[in-house]
Curated annotation (Swiss-Prot):
Keyword Hydrolase: no
Signal peptide (from-to): none
Gene designation per UniProt: apcE
Membrane topology: Peripheral membrane protein
Keywords: Antenna complex, Bile pigment, Chromophore, Electron transport, Lyase, Membrane, Photosynthesis, Phycobilisome, Repeat, Thylakoid, Transport
A GO MF label: lyase activity
UniProt superkingdom: Bacteria
EC number: 4.-.-.-
Binding site residues for (2R,3E)-phycocyanobilin: 190
InterPro entries recorded: Globin-like_sf, PBS_linker_dom, PBS_linker_sf, Phycobilisome_asu/bsu, Phycobilisome_asu/bsu_sf
Originating species: Synechocystis sp. (strain ATCC 27184 / PCC 6803 / Kazusa)
Name used for this protein in its record: Phycobiliprotein ApcE
Major localisation: membrane
């Protein structure tokens, strides 16, 4: 798969923390029910305490500096810690109506509560803030440094601020998500014990402001206790995505992301559950498999399966299998779709995710094509992944954002698959996207094909994703430039000939309307835009052309800009200024900016005002930035005041269509009545067959050259090689021949009888009695003392590896990587392990099997292996110790 592949850019908003209302509503929404009594009581208690929680947060916010200062004075010595606290920049609107008196009043309020002043300081000395860690030592400010002081004060202010967030949210989840795991981070820069003491001091200081309100004090202490416990807790391990396949990305999800996401309740059918709990589990299975509670929505159920799973006759895994094989599932999610789309939906319902890779789609597509829906369901339910995630009792659930790490290569398609509208999309998404990874970039807008309007005169008509989904993610990067077709002479395109931007297209392009009387292609000066040499009729023709270019049609009388038309006719404004006023009009804003997404609006405006589609991301991002910071009118000015507009149209020319996309040209050319005679006609070129060209000799060759060429390549020795294959041990002659061939292959000579009798008699008898096969006989020869004495002891490891591949694989080593692999085995485990790795390897089994004696194989791939094998076989075994496959070729031969 290409590393530049794109899985789409579907918008996903991960949940950063949980609140009481969101958690309660999310659980009810997942279970497709109304809020229960306990949840309503929880919400009632939360909203009743809302005023108190806001009061607590406001008090802590107003006295944040004093609280942080008290904590800093507790752990720092030798200076004023509060001077290092950098306050966040406040926006100006937030200061409207505020004054210095109100800020002074907040300080007075803090002191009146007994937390400030002399007595407050004495009280903080004698009050107990909690157990002090034994390793705590005050930190000297001078040695700690200004930079570290700023970071420490910032962190203490951060702890207090997030505590107020959690108090207002009514859920400590925001503290859990953002605090757990900070212990290891702060430990590298500061003392953990000092941080704990500072949090305890802030806890005591915050509680002092609510001594007269027991309920508020209890809330403050509760959330600070959670802050302390979460800070002391070790960093949780990441959630690793499970999967047995080699083509699935091994991804990890930080535990903080998992804690922040909406909790997805998991249901499991256990024997001890009550009847109501079992009904809830069955409904969860219906919601997962059929994407809705069919009992509630359609008054349908599969009663005999429900009774079996309730009574424990079948497991939840078997219940899911039978639901997916039911006629109801087949009718809704299999028959209306082609196999690839039905496969995607089955992944969503049974495994809770979309297909992960192209290989996975191909594997299960083959299953569903050959065995239908039952085979697909069995393959998914019986998979190792299903067993790891759900087992026998758990109902499958959606493993989406926040539940586990998501893959980038199927990001957009998987987010669409999790939506409720997924069954209404008939076009398969995963296989089409995976197939485009290794193809050229498509002819479409860089931010999706849905941003390309139909290239017609009337209005901005964009394809709708709800009717005919056509969006395809494509890996357009910032350096990609879209190919456009110039409407005019090809030599005048602005990419290859930038100086010809102002040249008019003539008869090959659109009709050009100008206000002055110059000839087409004449150089336009700065003051030629106000010429009124034409009469009223020609000026009105230019105005109509301007309306059609900007708006795509003629306007009604009440919609026309009469004042701007009069100024243009009188020469008060130029055509360029007139176009700018049209584009800034309220009608244009309502028609082509407000109803559309910013990307579509910019694309349409660019085609109308500059006469061409946008090139790529750099151009689009530039207009995006202007639109977000300055708005619609700044985008219009950026286009009309650009250098390209000045070069192409100047001050007196109405913009016209200069470039088309290939898709737009094809759409226009395919219309009835627009086909030319030279389109659609097949022209066959007479081409000489390639085999005829290759058979022709271009040069005159002499007899010595012909003889040399005929001797190139593999010799006839390969055709004359005799292969010894032991089919039956009853044929003693064949057994004897195979044994002799094995001696010649391994030892490169026939062995004397006395050597055979002393060392190999046992091996020969075992082979003759069919106790071992030829492969084991070869391995026994390689691990014998004779082989070790002849080919292992006298040579270095690299030479041993060369001779080993020659004797047991019939070739020279492939490359240095193979030599390194065998060298590691030989050095760490010895000769027997080296011989075993070759003889028991897949290459040996595929080439020789268990009953064939190894032989010279004449390998041709890789290219360097053939001459290396040739040299290895043509030289005598003990001729020299020079390597055939060296790691490098020396520049100067030493000792020559």
């Amino acid at each position: 798969m290409s590393v530049k592949a794109s899985g789409g850019s579907s918008l996903a908003r991960p949940q950063l923390y949980q609140t009481v209302p969101v958690s309660a509503i999310s659980q009810a929404e997942q279970q497709d029910r109304f809020l229960e009594g306990s949840e309503l009581n929880e919400l009632t208690a939360y909203f009743q305490s809302g005023a108190l929680r806001l009061e607590i947060a406001e008090t802590l916010t107003q006295n944040a500096d004093l609280i942080v200062s008290r904590a800093a004075n507790r752990i720092f010595t030798g200076g004023s810690p509060l001077s290092y606290l950098e306050k966040p920049v406040e926006r100006q609107p937030a200061l409207v109506g505020a004054s210095s008196d109100s800020r002074n009043g907040s300080v007075t309020y803090a002191e009146s509560n007994g937390s400030g002043g002399l007595f407050g300081g004495l009280r903080s000395v004698f009050s107990s803030t909690g157990p002090i860690p034994p390793g705590f030592r005050p930190i000297n400010i001078a040695r700690y440094g200004p930079s570290n002081m700023q970071k420490s004060l910032r962190d203490m202010s951060w702890f207090l601020r997030y505590t107020t967030y959690a108090i207002v949210a009514g859920d400590p989840n925001i503290i859990v998500v953002n605090t757990r795991g900070l212990k290891e981070v702060i430990e590298n820069a500061c003392s953990i014990d000092a941080t704990i003491v500072a949090i305890q001091e802030m806890r005591a200081a915050s509680a002092d402001y609510f001594r007269n309100n027991a309920q508020a004090k209890e809330i403050v202490l509760q959330y600070f206790d959670i802050l302390l416990s979460e800070f002391k807790a070790p960093t949780p391990a990441n959630k690793v995505r499970q999967g047995p396949s080699n083509d699935i990305q091994g991804l990890e999800l930080p535990q903080s992301y998992f804690n922040a996401a909406a909790k997805r309740q998991k249901y499991a059918m256990k024997p001890g559950l009550s009847a109501l709990e079992k009904n809830a589990v069955i409904k969860a299975a219906y919601r997962q498999i059929f994407e809705r509670d069919i009992t509630k929505a359609y008054s349908q159920s599969i009663s005999y399966l429900e009774s079996q799973v309730r009574n424990g006759d079948i497991s939840m895994k078997e219940f899911v299998r039978r639901l997916a094989k039911s006629p109801l599932y087949r009718k809704q999610f299999f028959e209306p779709f082609i196999n690839s789309r039905a496969l995607e939906l089955a992944f969503r319902h049974i495994l809770g995710r979309g297909p992960s890779s192209r290989e996975e789609v191909q594997k299960y597509f083959s299953i569903v094509s050959s065995g239908g829906l039952p085979a697909l369901v069995d393959a998914l339910v019986d998979s190792q992944e299903y067993a790891d995630y759900f087992g026998e009792e758990t109902v499958p659930y959606l493993r989406g954002l926040g539940v586990e790490a998501q893959e980038c290569r199927n990001w957009g398609m998987q987010q669409d698959l999790f939506s409720y509208s997924a069954p209404f999309r008939k076009v398969p998404q995963f296989i089409t996207t995976f197939a485009q990874y290794d193809r050229p970039l498509p002819d479409q807008h860089v931010y999706g094909s849905g941003n390309d309007p139909l290239e017609i005169q009337f209005g901005a008509i964009f394809p709708k994703e709800t009717r005919n989904p056509s969006k395809r993610p494509a890996p357009f990067n910032k350096d990609t430039k879209r190919i456009l077709i110039h409407r005019g002479p090809a030599v005048n395109n602005q990419v290859g000939n930038p100086s010809a931007v102002g040249e008019f297209p003539g008869s090959l392009g659109a009709k050009v309307f100008r206000l002055n009387g110059g000839l087409p292609g004449a150089k336009v000066g700065k003051n030629t835009g106000t010429s009124v040499k034409f009469g009223e009729s020609s000026t009105q023709a230019l105005i109509r052309a301007a309306y059609r270019q900007v708006f795509g049609r003629d306007l009604y009388e009440g919609q026309r800009l009469s004042v701007a038309e009069i100024q243009l006719e009188n020469g008060d404004i130029s055509v360029r200024e007139f176009i700018k006023r049209l584009a800034k009009s309220e009608l244009f804003l309502k028609l082509y900016w407000a109803p559309h997404y910013v990307c579509k609006a910019i694309e349409y405006m660019h085609r109308r005002l500059l006469g061409r589609p946008t090139y790529g991301r750099q151009e689009m991002n530039q207009y995006f930035d202007i639109a977000s910071k300055q708005g619609f009118y700044a985008v219009v000015e950026a286009m009309i005041d650009s250098k390209e507009y000045s070069d192409a149209f100047g001050e007196d020319t109405v913009p016209y269509e200069r470039y088309l996309t290939p898709g737009g040209l094809q759409m226009r050319s395919a219309r009835v009545g627009s086909l030319r005679e030279d389109i659609g006609q097949r022209v066959d070129k007479e081409v000489t067959p390639r085999f005829v060209e290759l058979g022709q000799v271009s040069a005159i060759r002499t007899e010595p050259e012909i003889a040399y060429r005929s001797n190139q390549g593999v010799t006839r020795q390969r055709q004359q090689t005799k292969v010894f294959k032991l089919v039956s041990t009853y044929d003693k002659v064949a057994v004897k021949n195979a044994i002799r061939a094995a001696y010649r292959q391994v030892f490169e000579r026939d062995l004397e009888p006395y050597i055979i009798n002393s060392e190999f008699t046992a091996l020969e008898s075992k082979l003759s009695n069919n106790e071992i096969n030829v492969k084991e006989f070869i391995e026994g020869l390689g691990t014998s003392e004779l082989y070790m004495k002849e080919f292992y002891a006298p040579y270095p490891n690299t030479k041993v590896i060369e001779m080993g591949t020659k004797h047991f694989l019939g070739r020279a080593p492939l490359n240095q990587k193979e030599i390194q692999q065998y060298n590691q085995i030989l050095a760490s485990q010895g000769l027997k392990a080296f011989i075993g790795a070759m003889v028991n390897g897949m290459e040996y089994l595929q080439t020789f099997g268990e009953d064939t004696v190894p032989y010279r194989r004449f390998p041709t791939l890789p290219a360097a292996n053939f001459p290396n094998t040739e040299r290895l076989y043509n030289k005598l075994t003990k001729q020299d110790k020079e390597l055939v496959v060296p790691s490098f070729t020396p520049v100067v031969k030493v000792g020559g």
